[in-house]
Amino acid sequence: DYKKRMENKSSVLLIFTGGTISMGENSSNHSLAPLDTKQVLSFIPELQMLHVNIASVSFSPLIDSSDIKPSNWVEIAGHIERHYNDFDGFVVLHGTDTMAYSAAALSFMLDGLKKPVIFTGSQLPVGVLRSDAKENLITAIELAAAKNERGEAMVPEVALMFEGKLMRGNRTTKRNAEDFDAFASFNYPELVRAGVHLKYYEHNIHREANDAQLKVANHFDDNIVVLKIFPGIRPETVKAVYSIAGLRAVVLETFGSGNAPTAQWLCDIISEATASGIVTVNVTQCRAGSVEMGHYEASVNLIKAGVVSGHDITLEAAVAKLMFLLGKYESTEDVKREMAVPWRGEMTI
């Protein structure tokens, strides 16, 4: 049975959204222009050596990842939902600038996921000589197709593949605008290391219950704002942000382990916002580590003001999760309760 299954090729669906990986270089003036799916794949003939059936769908038109918005996440999830029973895994080709946001969003949208959904892209276009696109895409497809001896997906979660590392999607952040090693997962270990061999860290990989069924959530509410605290921030600035019409939530980017100025005006503005039904989530500006409210005097006022701890969540995952929860729940209390606990392994508490 096992041998028979191994003889059958796995099948992977590529979902092209755009980004640098989908670009080619004009040989005459070296400008970059989008390539269609067939052209992109023609630059990587090695894909034929994989024991995998590959099919593809594409956004039309392809989009720069700086233009990504929640409706695009719904489109990606729609392709996965429609083709879920037809493929063993999915690879999303995406621009690097907002890839961590999209990977986080998809992790919350896809409840009961038992197949790999792997985001990847590149720092150099696929048509450029030293491009990292080839290695990233080949490895992403290989991992999306990989099964264990029971025929189950090796990595049945939303992940991000870049420069030899497969990371949990909602734990990643883009750490470098120029290096090939562009992404990091500072607060959660890798799922797979792709070196000479593929090394799976199984204890880091999440598995749903055997009877889990895919359910896709499509509602986001983007009435949120990210407010970064800085030395000298003025009361008028904070007041103006919290006074935005229709605002439902604020991601408050704080110092260190969740600290902010102890000035009473800040506590008063946030307390007033909390009383009016606006959710405030505390996320550290540090790339690694966790919010520990109450650890220092500088965060005690935030507790009094009703701020929710984001623990060690990334900014990207906090934004995506807030939009997701606001789309799911009308009640502020429901959003605050669920924001404080892990949904898809996006935080450690």
Predicted regions and their residues:
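Short Gly/Thr/Asp-enriched flexible loops that form oxyanion-binding sites at enzyme active sites
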Residues: 92-115, 262-269, 298
